[in-house]
Amino acid sequence: MTAVHSLPADVQAQVSAAEWQTRVDLAACYRLVALHGWDDLIFTHISAKVPGTEDFLINPFGLMFHEITASSLVKVDASGKKLMDSPYEINPAGYTIHSAVHEVRHDVECVLHTHTAAGIAVSCQKQGLLPLSQQSLFVLSSLSYHAYEGVALNHEEKARLQADLGASNFLILPNHGLLTCGGSIADTFLMMFTLQRACEVQVMAQSGGAELIHIPGQILAGARDMIAGVMRSKTGMGGQLAWPALLRKLDQQNPGYRQ
């Protein structure tokens, strides 16, 4: 087995400044997912487009999320071919899912997929995510579902995933997990934080056995424009506000992602 320290140390010298910054932010995102307890050993994946190209970065299959660094991320082209030397391969199911999104969603920089207990629990419910919390209000304005087809190794599934995702930023994969995609790594992380919290609240509320209060439909409909502003950095809000604070927390608890 290849040790983490055997990864090439000169990656920064081989890539553009823009790609290196994307690598740093994506490595931070992996470690933040681990810090929040959303990781699933070496499984699941987060990807980010290499600026100005159709290539994307994804995790080396075999590293835990809390270990990932800017240099260890694997760069692949649209066909999944590695573009730089790495002792690691990528998760083939990860390629299927992430390439499907990046192929058609040119507004998306980052795709984040998780297998959390609360996320899977909600994904198993026929009614899906319910309008129970303020967090669910944010999600329901841009939510789609993609039915489970088994482990995502069949590339023919890509077209169906693309059709189901459409223009949404949130995707629930029944019997499987959660996915968010956004115009920046920061926004995509914030979206997953919101979706994950909405699922946690739903599972906890249901466990109490009491009759639940649903957010009225007119509030859901009227909140769409406001939600778009809060969730996206291009409006001056969204992830760009929270990201520096998240990095400060990460620097205190698990630094090293910039290597």
UniProtKB/Swiss-Prot annotation:
GO terms for cellular component: cytoskeleton. Keywords: Metal-binding, Zinc. InterPro entries: Aldolase-II_Adducin_sf, Aldolase_II/adducin_N, Aldolase_II/adducin_N_sf. GO terms for biological process: monosaccharide metabolic process. Binds 1 zinc ion per subunit. Zn(2+) binds at residues 113, 115, 176. GO terms for molecular function: actin filament binding; metal ion binding. Its cofactor is Zn(2+). Belongs to the aldolase class II family. PANTHER family: ADDUCIN, PROTEIN HU-LI TAI SHAO. NCBIfam families: PRK07044.1. This is Putative aldolase class 2 protein PA3430. The lineage of its organism: Bacteria, Pseudomonadati, Pseudomonadota, Gammaproteobacteria, Pseudomonadales.
